[in-house]
Amino acid sequence: MSLNQTIIKIKSKALENNYLNDPVEREILVFSPDKIVDNAPLLIELAGLNGTPKLNNRFSQVLNKLYKKDLLKNAIIINPNFSTKYHVNQYINSPAAGNYEDFIINEIIPYMSELYHTKNVGLFGKSSGGFGAYTLAVNHPDIISGFADHFGDSCFEYVYIPDIPVTYKELYNKNINDYLIEKSKKDDLTDNEIRALNIIGMSAFYSYNENSELKFDLPFERDTGSFKPDIWNKWIKYDPAKNVVNYINNLKKLKAIYLDVGIEDEYSLFIGMGTLHKKMEKNGIEHKYEEFKGGHFYNTTRYEESIPFLIEKLSE
């Protein structure tokens, strides 16, 4: 007994004419039970670093394990392709990357809900995907009913600032557009290349600037590497550990909130996620928070905890 896996395609109006010329037509991997029933939950995975839908990967193995234990009930679970040339996606609208928030909220959810007659919607993801799940849920509690944020970007000062000197050195005397084109063709990026692409990508989402040649501003001076506090201030407006206090009423509307983090997370996200948890707790937000032994990577099995939790809450 295993889940049905189907790949469908959706053509997005929200992504038309995106600055990166990334594909407008996207694949969505759909996991569905043998019997499809009305009003089942719709769960959407938001990938971390450029995850693309693949049949029979670790994610599908986890889902099939849960399905055989009857923990997925009648839920429809989808894994869309949200990849960008920056190798990251924060799932918000940006003229420097594309309108991914609109793509999800205005296109994917209505399309899938109509196709499978689903009801409550839940988002889940790790790292950037966890950030996206939180951010979309707190901004659209009328559409999103719950989310699972697995060690998502938070307390940005610990996550991103260590990568800024690396990015400065990686980009020194280089044209950023040429750099992006070169790295987009590589399958085996070095650690420094990944870190540089991460800062470039975050700049595209957090500090976009339509008047700039690149459509975004970096948080450091290109010639010296010195920090730019004015740009950084744009970034931290998106920091869940800081902005959560602005969304208390919206969070209270949600049916399910799941947070977790590894106590050895390489990006110190045990600080960010712990802070987010404490602020939710202080403000009376019902949620589940777990810490586990491990780091930031190779943690797909954490979905064995969050997905059944979301499905149970969103099936009520």
PLM region descriptions:
Residues 1-316:
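Non-catalytic cap/lid and distal C-terminal segments of serine-dependent acyl enzymes
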